[in-house]
Amino acid sequence: MIVITGASSGLGAALTQQYAADACQLLISGRSEQKLAAVMAKLSTAEQANISVQAADLCVAEEVSQLFSQLSAPPTTVIHCAGSGYFGPLEQQNPQAIEQLISNNLTSSILVLRELVSRYRDHKVNVVVVMSTAAQAGKANESTYCAVKWAVKGLVESLRLELKGSPMKLIAVYPGGMATDFWSTSGKDIDTSSFMTADEAAIMLKNALVATQHGYVSDLTINRG
């Protein structure tokens, strides 16, 4: 079983299509039931039969717990794609929007990882946390966005130390700019014509997650060309 959060759009939706094409058993989640239904509508009847859908707000601990309580056995992989963007000069940013940015990106990651570790730290589960290249370098007019992504990176790297000796693996993913609906709600007017598509990023990520007997990719940066 593969669990994909943030599956209602962007990379999460693209990953859903990629894994569904391979007849994988999936549990997909996002905030919007309507958007999740739209993702499912793009799949064949046979692909849909392998997928469970659960709308959830991952900023709420109870809903995170309810999501994973649906599973009768530990998942093989959890891909946490949920998040949002918000950009602009710091002095012009709205305090409420900043709080929402922190909640959507950092709080959700903390609550999801907390739930996964409490349930599955003694199981062979690959936990993939999708961040951004904004977690690797500062960017003008992206100060708060970079801040929350750096915080998630710190969370992942610290938790790896706590999980030393555990069969659970944390995999950090840093994708560059993708041409998705992400930008329309971010407050940043940007030309995405040269950005990679979500499908391109999903293919690269899916391929990178194929482990061998003695090795796996622990950190992956997906740069746009």
Explain the meaning of each model-derived region:
Residues 8-9:
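Conserved glycine-rich cofactor-binding loop
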Residues 24-38:
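Conserved glycine-rich Rossmann-like NAD(P)H-binding loop of the short-chain dehydrogenase/reductase
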Residues 81-87:
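Conserved NAD(P)H cofactor-binding loop of Rossmann-fold oxidoreductase domains
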Residues 89-90, 94-102:
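Substrate-binding pocket helix/loop in short-chain dehydrogenase/reductase
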Residues 113, 148:
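Active-site helix of classical SDR
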Residues 132:
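Residue(s) in the substrate-gating loop at a strand-loop-helix junction
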Residues 172, 188-225:
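C-terminal helical subdomain
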